[in-house]
Curated annotation (Swiss-Prot):
UniProt-listed Gene3D superfamilies: 3.30.70.3370
InterPro entries: eRP_eS24_sf (IPR053709), Ribosomal_eS24 (IPR001976), Ribosomal_eS24_CS (IPR018098), Ribosomal_uL23/eL15/eS24_sf (IPR012678)
Keywords: Ribonucleoprotein, Ribosomal protein
Pfam families the record matches: Ribosomal_S24e
Name of this chain's protein: Small ribosomal subunit protein eS24
Keyword Ribosomal protein: yes
Region (Disordered): 91-110
Family, similarity comment: Belongs to the eukaryotic ribosomal protein eS24 family.
Residue ranges, compositional bias (Acidic residues): 97-110
Xref: SUPFAM superfamilies: Ribosomal proteins S24e, L23 and L15e
PROSITE patterns to which the protein is assigned, alphabetical: RIBOSOMAL_S24E
Coiled-coil positions: none
Species lineage: Archaea, Methanobacteriati, Methanobacteriota, Archaeoglobi, Archaeoglobales
């Protein structure tokens, strides 16, 4: 697990789309954190289930251990499925499956 700190810069409630929009700054050591790690940290910080959290982007500057991040927290999973674009949903799912495969390979190698 990466040492990750999250600083919420702006939070906005969007009642029309039934979600909260969070702009935050990430501070970390080493490599840029994955969407799964950011989603888990923000879900814990904002008291939301990880299934309702979508990481839209993580932008880093070359050579810095900081990144800017935009996250959407939907009221329900159904709202997320109806409103969010398919490629964004897949982008947030694919990393989960890839990391699970890596963990399975690491367990098999031992």
């Amino acid at each position: 697990m990466i040492d990750l700190e999250v600083y919420v810069e702006k939070e906005r409630h969007n009642p029309l789309l039934r979600r909260r929009e969070v702009y935050c700054r990430l501070s970390f050591e080493g490599k840029t954190p994955s969407r799964k790690e950011v989603r888990g940290k923000i879900a814990g910080l904002m008291n939301a289930e990880p299934e309702r959290v979508v990481v839209d982007y993580i932008k880093t500057e070359f050579g810095k251990t900081e990144a800017k991040c935009y996250v959407k927290i939907y009221d329900t999973v159904e709202d997320l499925q109806k409103i969010e674009e398919e490629h964004i949903i897949e982008r947030n799912k694919v990393e989960e499956q890839a990391e699970e495969a890596e963990e399975a390979e690491a367990g098999a190698a031992e």
